[in-house]
Amino acid sequence: VPTRAVSSLPWRDVIVATGATDRVLPVPGWTLPGVYTLGGAQVALKYQGCAIGDAVVFAGTGPLLYLVACQYAKAGANVVAVLDTAPASARYKAAPAMLGQPAVMAKGLALVAWLKLHGIPMHHGVRLLCAEGNAAIEQLVWQDSAGREQRTACSAVGMGYALRPETQLADLLGCAFEFSALHRCHVPRIDAMRRSSVAGVYLAGDGAGIMGADAAEYSGELAALALLQDRQITVDADRLAALRQRLQKIERFRHALEVAFPFPDDWAAHAGDDLVVCRCENVTAGTLRQTAAECGVHELNRLKALCRVGMGRCQGRMCGAAAAEILAQAQSVPLAQVGRLRGQAPIKPLPLDVTEVIEPEDHHA
């Protein structure tokens, strides 16, 4: 929407590279000022040159947890603690498989070593209990691996449980989806060349599954080569084979990361009924459970229609994963069975003062 004008661009082929957003699992108090996603904390530092607080805790799990903590500490921020819900033993279990990508593994170990060398406390196997404070967060309450309750004073928290694919544009383009146990969500179905189920639509990067920056680059090139191939343009077969081989190695490493940083699949069972899951519409876990029980709901979009979860400004990007976990737990069904929140246009909010509609030119991109 440039200069308050709506325009459209005709296309014959399109490569969709929408990336990823944070996967968030709420805790009581997560709506307090000072509680951020890991990605939000990283954006504040990288693009605005500021920290989210003067005493920051990073919590959750996944490689991004340690990367952002390191970035903050190296920038001079006061990182109070790193709280990882994954047990330390998970790293040792995953280590043999992670050796398939020694350079990437070394980068991760270097982050942890740097934090340890600079005296930043790191705790593993924790459970986040709540964020407390009056006008803003003042402390994070958590349970250590021995089951003891701990309280860490802080002015800000960066929280996240790895990333989730941003798939709404692929959804609106009509792409077929399938459940991925690895990603714990539905992702667009693609072939080995990144073709979607829709002719002329190719998917690159984390928007089709979280694989990281290197894989995003390789998959983008692979999608471009597939597009050229489909236009009957000769491409380098050796390059195709090399790209696919690299992506296969990264995918094996990705499976190892899931072992090293497991999703806390008991989160929904511990989520209290008063926990706000959808902050846009102020929908609690109790409302989700009650609606599911009273109306016999087993599908996420039906739940959305009945209680407005995921209908707010974020269109479910913030609450969709958590709502799916709650529904599956409440109805004792597999996560794959509850489905996914369907994308709705407009994907992002539009200004009300749009003044002009620009008609598309008569050409194909």
Residue ranges and their predicted role:
Residues 1-307, 311-313, 317-326, 330-365:
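Residues forming the flavin
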